C-alpha cells in the first residue's frame, strides 16, 4: 500500500516543464473531446426519445407504429403541436386581484376560527366587512387599490393583554376605505 501512496503523492506534485505543459494540455483536450462529444450526443438522443414518448400520445399517434422516427420529425411534430395549442385567455388585472383577495379572506376566516383573539361577533363583523369591501370598491373604481395596510379598528373582547392591563374597546369602522389611485400596473399579492 505504501508504494501506491508514494506514487499518488508523486503524481500530485508532478509539474511538467513549461513547454511540455501546453503540449500535455493539448493532448488531454484531444483525448477528452471525443468523450465529451459522445456524452453530448447521448444527452440529445435521450431528450429526443423522451420528447417522442411525450408528444406521440398528445397528437393521437401510436408509439408502436412510430418507433423509428428521425430527430427532425420529432422536432417538427413538437413544433406543430405547440403551435396548435389554443392560447390561454389571460385574466385581467382586476380578476386576478379579486381572486387573490378572496383567497386571503378565506385564509383569514380559517385563522380567526381557530384563534381566540377576537370575539365571535367581532370576527364575524370583520369577515363581513372584508367580503363587502371589494364589491363596494369595484363600483367606485375600475382598478384594484394600491398595496397598503387597511386601517380597520375592531371591537375586541374585554380581555387582558400580555402585560396584564385590560384591552381598550374601540369603535369599529363600517365604511370601506375609498379606492386609491393606481400607481403602477403590477399586482400586489398578500402572500
Curated annotation (Swiss-Prot):
Keywords: Developmental protein, Differentiation, DNA-binding, Neurogenesis, Nucleus, Repressor, Transcription, Transcription regulation. It holds the Pfam family HLH. GO terms for cellular component: nucleus. Expressed in the animal half of the early cleavage stage embryo. During neurulation and organogenesis, the otic vesicles and retina are the main sites of expression; expression in otic placodes begins as early as stage 13.5, persisting in the otic vesicles at stage 30 and beyond. Also transiently expressed in the olfactory placodes. In addition, weakly expressed in primary neurons. Expression in the retina begins at stage 21, and is seen throughout the neural retina by stage 30. Induction: Differentially regulated in the ectoderm and neuroectoderm by notch and neurog2/ngnr1. PROSITE patterns: BHLH. GO terms for molecular function: bHLH transcription factor binding; protein heterodimerization activity; protein homodimerization activity; RNA polymerase II cis-regulatory region sequence-specific DNA binding. InterPro entries: bHLH_dom, HES_HEY, HLH_DNA-bd_sf. Residues 1-26, 159-191 are annotated as: Disordered. Residues 159-173, 182-191 have a biased composition (Polar residues). A motif (WRPW motif) lies at residues 188-191. GO terms for biological process: cell differentiation; negative regulation of DNA-templated transcription; negative regulation of neurogenesis; negative regulation of transcription by RNA polymerase II; nervous system development; positive regulation of gliogenesis; regulation of neurogenesis; retina morphogenesis in camera-type eye. It comes from the Eukaryota. Residues 28-85 form the bHLH domain. Residues 97-130 form the Orange domain. It is found in: Nucleus. Transcription repression requires formation of a complex with a corepressor protein of the Groucho/TLE family. Homodimer, and heterodimer with the other bHLH proteins neurod1, neurod4/ath3, hes1/hairy1 and hes6r. Weakly interacts with the bHLH protein hey1/hrt1. Transcriptional repressor. Essential in the retina to govern glial versus neuronal differentiation. Promotes gliogenesis through the inhibition of neuronal differentiation by at least two distinct mechanisms; represses proneural gene transcription, and also physically interacts with proneural proteins, including neurod1. Has a particular type of basic domain (presence of a helix-interrupting proline) that binds to the N-box (CACNAG), rather than the canonical E-box (CANNTG). This is Transcription factor HES-2. It comes from Xenopus laevis (African clawed frog).
Amino acid at each position: 500500500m505504501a508504494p501506491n501512496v508514494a506514487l499518488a503523492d508523486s503524481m500530485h506534485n508532478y509539474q511538467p516543464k513549461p513547454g511540455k505543459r501546453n503540449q500535455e494540455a493539448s493532448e488531454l483536450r484531444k483525448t477528452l473531446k471525443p468523450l465529451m462529444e459522445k456524452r453530448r450526443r447521448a444527452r440529445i438522443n435521450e431528450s429526443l426519445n423522451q420528447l417522442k414518448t411525450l408528444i406521440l400520445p398528445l397528437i393521437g399517434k401510436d408509439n408502436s407504429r412510430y418507433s423509428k422516427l428521425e430527430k427532425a420529425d420529432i422536432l417538427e411534430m413538437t413544433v406543430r403541436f405547440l403551435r396548435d395549442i389554443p392560447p390561454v385567455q389571460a385574466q385581467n388585472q382586476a380578476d386576478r386581484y379579486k381572486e387573490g383577495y378572496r383567497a386571503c379572506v378565506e385564509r383569514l376566516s380559517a385563522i380567526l376560527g381557530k384563534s381566540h383573539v377576537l370575539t365571535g361577533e367581532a370576527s364575524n363583523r370583520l369577515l363581513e366587512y372584508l367580503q363587502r369591501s371589494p364589491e363596494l370598491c369595484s363600483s367606485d373604481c375600475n382598478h384594484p387599490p394600491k398595496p397598503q395596510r387597511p386601517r380597520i379598528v375592531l371591537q375586541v373582547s374585554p380581555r387582558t393583554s400580555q402585560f396584564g392591563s385590560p384591552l381598550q374597546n374601540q369603535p369599529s369602522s363600517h365604511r370601506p376605505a375609498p379606492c386609491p389611485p393606481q400607481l403602477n400596473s403590477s399586482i400586489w399579492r398578500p402572500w
